[in-house]
A protein has these predicted regions:
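N-terminal targeting signals for export/organelle localization
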Residues: 2-7, 21-115, 294
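Bacterial N-terminal signal peptides
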Residues: 9-20
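Typically the conserved alpha-helix immediately C-terminal to a functionally engaged Cys/Sec
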Residues: 142, 148-163
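A short beta-strand-turn-helix
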Residues: 118-136, 161
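C-type cytochrome heme c attachment motif
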Residues: 137, 144-151, 190, 205, ...
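Short active-site neighborhood of thiol/selenol oxidoreductases, capturing the structured segment around
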Residues: 131-147, 169-173
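Acidic/His-rich structured neighborhood in mature extracellular/periplasmic domains
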Residues: 108-126, 144, 148
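Cysteine-centric redox/oxidoreductase cores and disulfide-bonded domains
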Residues: 26-37, 42, 68, 78, ...
Length: 294
């Protein structure tokens, strides 16, 4: 609905929802909570969205406050502005235009990726490629039964070859089922981490190859033997891998990665964290190059 109001010398156009809030009259100290409650009730937010209060300040509309909030979803931080009158009785949700200028857009700012504390990722426990102190650190949650993960890895491999000194890539196991073929293969590949970082990547690259993808649904024994052949041909310690399987080392690694991913909001693969910014889906080359300053 389009509403036009003339207040003194200020011409306002509200492309908005105009609401009368019951029961909040005279509660001036509760303006921020009124804004939060209104957004939660009327914006149709995705499940699990957190609403954070940022600030309250005078609005261009006489008698109203501009209340800035931050909507934290699984992958983004979305700033919004809610206009609440000083009695707490009236609320505007939407776009405020003053003399042809979109004031709301100016006040709100840009949507940003959701921030993730790097300490939560426990990167030191995971296999990686690239230098320790790289300009860009990428942590990706992935699994070998995911076609989008395969596509993401092919793009990532090209970028690692193009910028070998600038990108550190960390792999996290995230099979989408608690059991079954995907989980089983993830645990077996994770067991190679006990052998060495290099051993893991040999096996990782094989199962993300065209040949490896034809074998991922094979029985456990066949997969184990194939991994042992790869390790033996490359001169790695096969017994260390066998010990890792016996002690369920790979199972533990996968459980830890899944727990970390779940904690930070991973719900699908691939998902990643780039320099602390959460990204859902295939990591776009252009996005990564922006972090590189290219």
């Amino acid at each position: 609905m389009l509403k036009k109001m003339s207040l003194g010398t200020v011409c306002l156009i509200f492309l908005s929802i105009f609401l009368t809030v019951q029961g909040f009259a005279q509660q001036k100290d509760n303006i921020g909570q009124i804004a939060i409650d209104t957004v939660r009730a009327h914006m149709g937010l995705p499940p699990g969205t957190e609403i954070k209060y940022v600030e309250k300040r005078e609005s261009p509309v006489p008698g109203f406050y501009s209340v800035r909030l931050l909507l934290v979803t699984t992958d983004r931080e979305i700033p919004v502005v809610v206009y609440v009158d000083k009695t707490g009785e009236k609320v505007f949700l939407g776009t405020l235009v003053v003399k042809g200028e979109n004031v709301t857009r100016k006040e709100v700012g840009e949507t940003k990726p959701r921030k993730v504390d790097p300490a939560l990722l426990e990167m030191e426990k995971s296999p990686f490629r690239g230098p320790f102190q790289a300009k860009v650190t990428i942590v990706e949650f992935s699994n070998f039964h995911c076609s989008y993960c395969l596509k993401s890895w092919k793009g990532m491999k090209e970028l690692l070859g193009r910028y070998p000194r600038d990108i550190k890539y960390v792999f996290k196991h995230f099979p989408l089922q608690s059991n079954g073929k995907a989980r089983e293969l993830s645990e077996m590949v994770a067991a190679t981490q006990m052998v060495s970082n290099e051993a893991f990547w040999e096996v990782h690259d094989f199962f993300f190859s065209d040949e490896g993808q034809t074998l991922i649904n094979g029985d456990r024994e066949r997969l184990r033997l194939r991994i042992e052949v790869i390790l033996k041909l490359k001169g790695f310690d096969v017994k260390a891998f066998q010990t890792a399987l016996h002690t369920r080392y790979g199972k533990t690694r996968v459980e830890e990665d899944v727990a970390i991913g779940t904690k930070i909001g991973v719900g699908a693969t691939p998902s990643g964290v780039i320099n602390g910014d959460f990204v859902r889906g295939i990591l776009p080359e252009k996005t990564i190059e922006k972090y590189l300053g290219k």
